[in-house]
Amino acid sequence: NHPSTIWTRSSSQHYDWLFRLFRMLSAEYSMRYSNGVFKVHKSWEKLGKLLETVPKNIEDNGWEDPPQCMPDYCKDNDVVTAYRNYYIKEKSYFAKWKFINQPDWYNEGLKNANIRL
């Protein structure tokens, strides 16, 4: 019963948004790692069709932003800003961008937080 799973099943809009994110992350994986031979991530291969339809027991209860599951000092009124803060302040030791450049928001955030990798 993690806050994110509670959020996901609290509205069909949340479930659908998360499924679309899953689809986009799978496409990102294929773009980055195919390298001449098209690759599909195993999770998409096994679960894509299965999870595509919102379960019947999840009603449309409108939209709320996803929960901010992070230390309070990373949180922000804007959920995207909060998760960016979290990656900069807590996850920079492992965050990697293979085959693409790091996003500008990440580089700027590291500089502002005075974090050197």
Give names to the regions the model predicted.
Residues 1, 5-117:
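Sequence termini and other peripheral, non-core segments
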